[in-house]
UniProtKB/Swiss-Prot annotation:
Belongs to the Psb30/Ycf12 family. PSII is composed of 1 copy each of membrane proteins PsbA, PsbB, PsbC, PsbD, PsbE, PsbF, PsbH, PsbI, PsbJ, PsbK, PsbL, PsbM, PsbT, PsbX, PsbY, PsbZ, Psb30/Ycf12, peripheral proteins of the oxygen-evolving complex and a large number of cofactors. It forms dimeric complexes. This is Photosystem II reaction center protein Psb30. Pfam families: PSII_Ycf12.
């Protein structure tokens, strides 16, 4: 595999993994308010 392909896979993994975390943080902030 090329480094570019690996970099793209890592970027996609970070985006997919950070998605739910961001939603959870926003929900927590709204809950605290």
């Amino acid at each position: 595999m090329n480094l570019e392909v690996i970099a793209q896979l890592i970027a996609l993994a970070l985006i997919v993994g950070s998605g739910p975390l961001v939603i959870a943080l926003l929900a927590a902030r709204k809950g605290n308010l």
